[in-house]
């Protein structure tokens, strides 16, 4: 009978050890997956080029001599444009002027409304980079404001 109790103790010890190893493995795997999802080298590299400056409004970042605001709310293209002006009278939806600027904005997140941009090579109003976007600017999306650009009326894009 004593041997039978020892067998249960050994079995319980193996189960507990197996559970501990499983928990450690799962926690390690989750950390690796989280790191891959959150830590993207291209974002880290481009964010280093963006920083907060005293001459930019509060909660705006400076990039390429522009003050940029990334919205957290969703609006149509026209509403986003109006919201930019409400945030700062000298702002509008950002006009992307260089491939590096486009890369920087894409590395942060896609699906933002932006103003007209020759770099996007769009031929008609309301063209988009994002998947499943409407072609008339009525889909509610986040938007990017800038204090140094003035997009033309009725031209909208998302990145």
From Swiss-Prot:
Annotated Gene3D superfamilies: Mannose-Binding Protein A, subunit A (3.10.100.10)
Family annotation (SMART domains): CLECT
BP term (GO), one: positive regulation of natural killer cell mediated cytotoxicity
Signal peptide: none
Keyword Transmembrane helix recorded: yes
The keyword Cell division is assigned to this record: no
Assigned keywords, A-Z: Early protein, Host membrane, Lectin, Membrane, Signal-anchor, Transmembrane, Transmembrane helix
Membrane topology of the entry: Single-pass type II membrane protein
Descriptive protein name: Protein A40
Organism (species): Vaccinia virus (strain Western Reserve)
